């Protein structure tokens, strides 16, 4: 790249982050023209991306949590090929960045400005974009707090049911999923549809997901009614919840459920009874570590035939 120029769109809560300030100053000392803009309210990310592109920026840095990354990725995807994205993970979960092996240290993360950009996929449903993952579940009662009983039953997977709304009761509902050469129907407890691999602060739902294969990884947690009643015993006996998932890898999948399915798109809520998820292949250029586990090339190297 001839001009070392980038714009950092930083979540407003991170304005006083000294590590970020030091990292920015360090890049400036290296000769980068690095400008910073802060988000304050909904819609700011979209506006700031548009202003950055109009000002000639071709590298944009997203500084914040998974929601901030999603907002900026969505804004960039609306203007394909205009600029590439660097991720500066500053949230509590940082699920996409962790799975991609992006450093959580601001100075190291900004070194990706020098790394090649890769064309990666995005997930799409109902006109909304997600960079990392969509998770969904059913709740018969919604409360303000995470159910402690539910946490005890499900352990690390509890977020599946509490990530969007705090469900005080765990129950299944009938669902049907259909995609190319794939059809599943039955009682469904929860599901994950991943472009990335993990959600909810490190819980791996789609362990083999790649961001440049043009596919979404589907993980279904089925639940015949008799299984719901014995789920606690199964888990306490060492029957890992990971073994219970039905998995598929598809360019798109249609989901129909008997009652409203609560979906979490990288923190954004969505609800529906008939939804179509699709991968938008190569929709975004992102700077990733050369050995990122989410890249197909890395996968081939580490898993030779």
Curated annotation (Swiss-Prot):
It is an enzyme of class 2 (transferase). ATP binds at residues 39, 65-71, 92. Its cofactor is Mg(2+); Ca(2+). Binds 1 Mg(2+) ion per subunit. Ca(2+) may be able to substitute. The keyword Lipid metabolism applies. Its EC number is 2.7.1.-. Keywords: ATP-binding, Cytoplasm, Kinase, Lipid biosynthesis, Lipid metabolism, Magnesium, Metal-binding, Nucleotide-binding, Phospholipid biosynthesis, Phospholipid metabolism, Transferase. Pfam families: DAGK_cat (PF00781), YegS_C (PF19279). Mg(2+) binds at residues 210, 213, 215. InterPro entries: ATP-NAD_kinase_N (IPR017438), Diacylglycerol/lipid_kinase (IPR005218), Diacylglycerol_kinase_cat_dom (IPR001206), Lip_kinase_YegS (IPR022433), Lipid_Phosphate_FormReg (IPR050187), NAD/diacylglycerol_kinase_sf (IPR016064), YegS/DAGK_C (IPR045540). One of its GO terms (cellular component) is cytoplasm. One of its GO terms (biological process) is phospholipid biosynthetic process. The active site is at residue 268. It is found in: Cytoplasm. Residues 1-129 form the DAGKc domain. GO terms for molecular function: ATP binding; lipid kinase activity; magnesium ion binding. PANTHER family: LIPID KINASE YEGS, SPHINGOSINE KINASE. Belongs to the diacylglycerol/lipid kinase family. YegS lipid kinase subfamily. NCBIfam families: lip_kinase_YegS, PRK13054.1, YegS/Rv2252/BmrU family lipid kinase. Probably phosphorylates lipids; the in vivo substrate is unknown. This is Probable lipid kinase YegS-like. It comes from Pseudomonas fluorescens (strain Pf0-1).
């Amino acid at each position: 790249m001839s001009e070392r120029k980038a714009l950092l769109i930083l979540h407003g809560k991170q304005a006083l982050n000294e590590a970020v300030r030091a990292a920015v100053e360090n890049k400036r000392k290296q000769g980068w023209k690095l400008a910073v803009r802060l988000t304050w309210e909904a819609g700011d990310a979209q506006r700031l991306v548009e202003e950055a592109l109009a000002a000639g920026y071709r590298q944009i840095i997203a500084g914040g949590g998974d929601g901030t990354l999603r907002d900026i990725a969505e804004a960039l995807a609306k203007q394909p090929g205009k600029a590439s994205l660097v991720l500066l993970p500053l949230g509590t979960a940082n699920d996409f960045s962790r799975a991609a092996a992006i450093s959580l240290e601001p100075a190291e993360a900004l070194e990706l400005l020098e790394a090649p950009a890769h064309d990666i996929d995005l997930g799409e449903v109902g006109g909304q974009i997600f960079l990392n993952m969509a998770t969904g579940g059913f709740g018969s009662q919604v409360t303000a707090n995470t159910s402690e009983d539910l946490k005890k039953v499900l352990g690390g997977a509890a977020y599946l049911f509490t990530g969007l709304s705090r469900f005080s009761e765990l129950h299944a509902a009938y669902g049907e999923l259909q995609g190319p050469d794939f059809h599943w129907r039955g009682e469904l407890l929860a599901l994950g549809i991943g472009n990335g691999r993990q959600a909810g602060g490190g819980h791996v739902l789609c362990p083999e997901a790649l961001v440049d294969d043009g596919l979404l990884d589907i993980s279904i947690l089925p639940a015949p009614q008799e299984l719901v009643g014995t789920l606690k015993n199964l888990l306490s006996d060492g029957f890992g919840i990971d073994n219970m998932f039905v998995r598929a890898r598809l360019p798109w999948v249609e989901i129909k459920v008997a009652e409203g399915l609560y979906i979490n798109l990288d923190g954004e809520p969505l609800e529906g009874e008939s939804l179509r998820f699709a991968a938008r292949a190569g929709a975004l250029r992102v700077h990733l570590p050369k050995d990122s586990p989410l890249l197909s090339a890395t996968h081939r190297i580490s898993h030779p035939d």
